């Protein structure tokens, strides 16, 4: 259907700079709307004043964190054809008027968005907005989990750093500072002096096979007892926060599990190297209908690009730059693919042999690759296997997926 108007929105937390153009590029209106019901009602009034109906309007938004989602949902429900553009695309498709000056204002941005819609509407199909509340909720949970995981990792590092001052003997005895054994010891005796003051039987109960090592480390330590006692409350505070965050992470995992597409997760975990966690990430970020993107040979490069594994070419005349992965896609998926590729080297003889071949060269003039280059190739091979398994809807088997 031919659209009569183009509506562009550059959305921030509390406002949306909006421009309405006719299909030929003539500007009808530009202004700022609040991100509220009042802003929506004002938009409806403006559209009516200029004879624009949302079903006959091409709407383009620039993806801005999560701020664009309420607008995209409301516009979609009102019958508009909504496209959510990658900010990098919007930034690089400069308008002719601003290409040399490179001004950066909200008005310039929203004008550029409208111009993209006018010039490239036929090529924007992959940016068409489709409401998927359940999938978006799963993405938000995964994002929350990654934040919790990162915070927990930083807390564990902080605990170890504090123990270097308070109870270095615990680390010297090779007792993991984040283990249940360390927690029990620190609860009863947070310093070397407090440990030596405990009865032999209690020390044996707390440290087990590590008692002798810890006793010796406490005897050899240079830590000042008064200073250690003064700083011990900081260790207890960090340990309490660590335990609370670990429990919160477990609850987050429990919320994610029932929301995952179990059949897809089962297929992905059949691949060597993929576990429950990495399979969950891939199932979360792979579009539900990606199998319909075309033949498998076309799907694979598109999935690679989705996770930023596609090569970024740099050539000009006789000069050839170093080819690197683009890293433009979904970072969480790329991390999961790296973890799966790394694990596959230990659990899949075929993949280990493939990695070894990449590192040594094939003996026919093809150069050997560095570890990083070889790992990227292994990640791409995992993508080929992933696509083969999901498109065939069958668990992985060497005989049935030789093409991967």
Protein language model annotation of sequence segments:
Residues 1-404:
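A detector of single, family-specific signature residues
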């Amino acid at each position: 259907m031919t659209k009569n108007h183009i509506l562009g929105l550059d959305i921030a937390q509390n406002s949306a700079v909006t421009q309405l153009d006719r299909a030929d590029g003539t500007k009808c209106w530009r202004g700022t709307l609040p991100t509220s019901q009042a802003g929506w009602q004002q938009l409806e009034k403006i559209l009516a004043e200029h004879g624009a109906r949302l079903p006959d309007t091409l709407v383009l938004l620039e993806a801005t964190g999560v701020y664009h989602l309420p607008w995209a949902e409301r516009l979609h429900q009102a019958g508009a054809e909504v496209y959510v553009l990658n900010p990098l695309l919007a930034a690089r498709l400069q308008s002719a008027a601003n290409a040399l000056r490179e001004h950066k204002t909200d008005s310039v941005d929203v004008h550029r968005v409208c111009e993209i819609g006018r010039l490239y509407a036929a090529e924007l199909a992959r940016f068409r907005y489709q409401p998927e509340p359940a999938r978006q909720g799963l993405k938000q949970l995964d994002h929350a989990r990654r934040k919790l995981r990162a915070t927990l990792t930083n807390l564990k590092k902080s605990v170890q750093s504090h123990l270097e001052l308070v109870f270095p003997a615990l680390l010297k005895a090779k007792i993991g500072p984040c283990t249940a054994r360390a927690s029990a010891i620190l609860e009863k005796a947070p310093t070397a002096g407090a440990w030596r003051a405990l009865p032999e039987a209690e020390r044996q109960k707390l440290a087990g096979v590590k008692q002798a090592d810890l006793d010796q480390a406490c005897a050899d330590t240079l830590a000042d007892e008064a200073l250690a006692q003064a700083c011990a409350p900081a260790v207890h505070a960090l340990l309490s926060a660590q335990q609370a965050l670990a429990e919160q992470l477990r609850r987050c995992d429990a919320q994610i599990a029932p929301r995952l597409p179990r059949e897809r997760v089962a297929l992905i975990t059949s691949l060597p190297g993929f576990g429950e966690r990495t399979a969950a990430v891939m199932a979360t970020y792979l579009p539900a209908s990606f199998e319909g993107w075309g033949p498998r040979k076309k799907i694979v490069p598109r999935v690679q690009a989705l996770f930023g594994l596609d090569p970024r070419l740099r050539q000009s005349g006789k000069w050839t730059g170093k080819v690197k992965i683009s890293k433009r896609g979904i970072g969480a998926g790329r991390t999961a693919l790296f973890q799966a590729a790394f694990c596959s080297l230990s659990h899949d003889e075929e993949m280990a042999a493939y990695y070894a071949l990449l590192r040594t060269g094939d003996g026919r003039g093809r150069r050997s690759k560095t570890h990083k280059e070889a790992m990227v190739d292994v990640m791409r091979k995992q993508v080929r296997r992933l696509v083969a398994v999901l498109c065939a809807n069958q668990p992985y088997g060497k005989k049935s997926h030789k093409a991967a």
